[in-house]
Amino acid sequence: MTMRLALAAAALAVCVAPALAQKSTADGLRDCEKLAAVKFKQENPAFKKFAIDATDVNEDKFADKVGTQFVSTVYHGKATYQADGKPDDVRFVCLHAGLGKGAVFVYTLPR
């Protein structure tokens, strides 16, 4: 009986682990917004907001290194950047290192 219970628990763990390891696009974009908020506030004390338009995001699986940094996914699309005055529409690029690592680079370009 104990052996069956142990095998059942092991089988359940094997099935659940991949589901827990997966990270959604929304989670990745949240990581990008968090990194952007820190980075942009350091660069510009007047920074107020960076918000990604999740309806217009491209997600490219990369799984390679950029220099010495592993990057699993490249997100790019439209976002809103606000420092002083009204918000600006921008394009963004975010390099994400994967589960447990988070976003490692965020850059904006004017639209």
Task: Place the predicted regions along the sequence by residue.
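Bacterial N-terminal signal peptides that target proteins for export
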Residues: 1-7
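N-terminal signal peptide c-region/cleavage motif recognized by signal peptidases
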Residues: 16-18
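Mitochondrial intermembrane space
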Residues: 20-111
